[in-house]
């Protein structure tokens, strides 16, 4: 299966081309969030280097957020347009899920953290289950046990202590290396918990997570794709600007 995965949720986004779980190539964004032009240039360059055409893509995988509201909308529109035009399925992947896929934590609970600004942080609580019986997925399967949250440091510290009391060193908190605000939360996390830093480029993880979902039939029609803003009120305000 040929998967085109892309992440337009931040200035560290980009696109990646995978054959099943094998990376073929990737292109990184230029540091801006002008994805209305940049995404299509990156995709053209990626496919040209691989000697492939867009029509050969079997699955479109897109990061659905949280992140830049404009970037998210551009990515979703592109995925929907390509999937609809070519009659292909699409899979949305949250940035939080992609962070867990990039971190590959060894424990049983993973908590990715993102700076949401306004004194809050986006996070999710993911729990692992054993590899599927067919052995198609390397390592454990991670599934969210809560909806995405936007919490301040005090509430994050309370949640961290609750999870550490439950699972100790089996808990891993995941932050992106460029996210200084999230990294500063380290003092609020119990010492027993693990602390994992990942890069901010997630296009490859988006493609891998989408492939694993597609193997289980968990793909979307273009009209089913939706953004993962978490803080919906912010999204609505930005949409009106």
Which residue ranges define each predicted feature?
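N-terminal beta-alpha supersecondary unit
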Residues: 1-66, 200
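Generic secondary-structure signature for well-ordered alpha-helical cores
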Residues: 48, 52, 190, 212-219, ...
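Surface "functional belts" at beta-alpha junctions
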Residues: 22, 34, 89-201, 229, ...
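DPxDG-like acidic metal-binding loop motif
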Residues: 61-92
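Stable alpha-helical structural segments in soluble proteins, enriched in small hydrophobic residues
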Residues: 46-50, 85, 103, 206-214
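Glycine-rich phosphate-binding/hydrolytic loop that grips phosphoryl groups
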Residues: 197-227
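A general structural signal for well-ordered alpha-helical segments in protein cores
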Residues: 36, 40, 79, 96, ...
């Amino acid at each position: 299966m040929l998967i085109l995965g892309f992440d337009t949720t931040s200035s560290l986004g980009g696109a990646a081309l995978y054959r099943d779980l094998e990376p073929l190539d990737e292109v990184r964004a230029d540091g801006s969030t002008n994805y209305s032009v940049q995404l299509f240039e990156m995709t053209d360059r990626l496919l040209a280097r691989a000697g492939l055409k867009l029509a050969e893509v079997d699955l479109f995988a897109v990061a659905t957020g949280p992140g830049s509201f404009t970037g998210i909308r551009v990515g979703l529109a592109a995925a929907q347009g390509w999937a609809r035009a070519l009659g292909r399925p699409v899979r949305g992947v949250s940035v939080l899920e992609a962070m867990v896929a990039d971190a590959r934590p060894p424990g049983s609970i993973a908590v990715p953290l993102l700076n949401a600004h306004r004194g809050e942080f986006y996070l999710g609580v993911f729990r692992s289950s054993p590899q599927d019986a067919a052995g198609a997925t390397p390592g454990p399967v991670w599934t969210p046990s809560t909806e995405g949250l936007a919490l301040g440091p005090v509430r994050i510290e309370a949640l961290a202590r609750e999870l550490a009391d439950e699972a100790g060193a089996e808990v891993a908190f995941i932050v992106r290396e460029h996210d200084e605000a999230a990294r500063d939360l380290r003092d609020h996390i119990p010492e027993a918990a693990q602390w994992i830093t990942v890069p901010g480029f997630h296009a490859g993880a988006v493609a891998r997570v989408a492939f694993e979902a597609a193997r289980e039939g968990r793909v979307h029609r273009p009209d089913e794709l939706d953004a993962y803003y978490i803080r919906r009120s912010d999204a609505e305000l930005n949409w009106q600007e």
